């Protein structure tokens, strides 16, 4: 029997409760009130540091019954900084997350990266070596007005990898500007990428700008059947995300770069929220 891969983590935050760190998923719950102002990005410092096992990436997302949308973050293996959750208020007035109304989830997934000698249309090599996702650039100039949702159509079929499914995720840099991308599958016939501007400013995105990322999730992680090890809050109810079976191992020195993390210090380090370009 194969040993269960380990996710190493360190956590210390008086405003969050570590509710669960079982096989597959770590969950935090807010202990204090979080105020989200209209048309303003809210970031929640988690006091959480994590490193995935080899061949895995990490996914970070939030869930709540309140009118609040969370950026689904892809945490690259080379990222060594503190994890932070990006939230957007759906309403045009204040929203309040009272204690226990926000759950923050961290889970691992297996992935692969296609071998590309050169960029293929809008699909580009990532900014940092070893990143989970490929960069995807805009095929045209784009303007997003406050609280507007637009779709960008990509017709070029992505490179194929056996047993893996190309999936679109947003970028932390754009999420910090108030632009959230709805994660979705990129199928052979193309994909319509949905972007929503939650800010109070009209945002102009130039042609060829990196606006989302393409991640090849192992097919095991995509299912249409609910189980205790899946979540509909990532990709939606028609394609649930099922996380990898990993054990969480607490390593208090992780935040200081201990435990064999020196190999990552020359790469991404703490740049971005786990996505390149922030």
UniProtKB/Swiss-Prot annotation:
Chain segments annotated as coiled-coil in the UniProt record: none
SUPFAM superfamilies, A to Z: dUTPase-like
Entry keyword set: Hydrolase, Magnesium, Metal-binding, Nucleotide metabolism
GO terms, molecular function: dUTP diphosphatase activity; metal ion binding
UniProt key word Nucleus: no
Keyword Disulfide bond: no
Biological process terms in GO annotation: dUTP metabolic process
Residues binding substrate, per UniProt: 171-173, 273-274
EC number: 3.6.1.23
Cofactor: Mg(2+)
Top-level taxon: Viruses
Substrates-to-products reaction catalysed: dUTP + H2O = dUMP + diphosphate + H(+)
Entry similarity comment: Belongs to the dUTPase family.
Free-text function comment from the UniProt entry: Involved in nucleotide metabolism: produces dUMP, the immediate precursor of thymidine nucleotides and decreases the intracellular concentration of dUTP to avoid uracil incorporation into viral DNA.
Protein name, UniProt field: Deoxyuridine 5'-triphosphate nucleotidohydrolase
Upper classification of the organism: Viruses, Duplodnaviria, Heunggongvirae, Peploviricota, Herviviricetes
């Amino acid at each position: 029997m194969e040993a269960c891969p380990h996710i190493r983590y360190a956590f210390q935050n008086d405003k969050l409760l570590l509710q669960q760190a079982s096989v597959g998923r770590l969950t935090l719950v807010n202990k204090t009130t979080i105020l989200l102002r209209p048309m303003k990005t809210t970031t929640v410092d988690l006091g959480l540091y994590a490193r995935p096992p080899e061949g895995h990436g990490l996914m970070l997302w939030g869930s709540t019954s309140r009118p609040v949308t969370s950026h689904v973050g892809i945490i690259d293996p080379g990222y060594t900084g503190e994890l932070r959750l990006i939230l957007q208020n759906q309403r045009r007035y204040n929203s309040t997350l009272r204690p226990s109304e926000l759950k923050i989830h961290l889970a691992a997934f297996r992935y692969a990266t296609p071998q590309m000698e050169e960029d293929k249309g809008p699909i580009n090599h990532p900014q940092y070596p070893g990143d989970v996702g490929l960069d995807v650039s805009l095929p045209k100039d784009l303007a997003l007005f406050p609280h507007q949702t637009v779709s960008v159509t990509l017709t070029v079929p992505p490179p194929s990898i056996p047993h893996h499914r190309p999936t679109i995720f947003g970028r932390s840099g754009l999420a910090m500007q108030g632009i959230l991308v709805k994660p979705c599958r990129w199928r052979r016939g193309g994909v319509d990428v949905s972007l929503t501007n939650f800010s109070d400013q009209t945002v102009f995105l130039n042609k060829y700008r990196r606006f989302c990322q393409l991640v090849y999730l192992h097919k095991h992680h995509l299912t249409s059947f609910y189980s205790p090890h899946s979540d509909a809050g990532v990709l939606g109810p028609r394609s649930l995300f099922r996380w990898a079976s990993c054990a969480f191992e607490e390593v208090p020195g992780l935040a200081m770069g201990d435990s064999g993390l020196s190999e990552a210090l020359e790469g991404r380090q703490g740049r971005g929220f786990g996505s390149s370009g922030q």
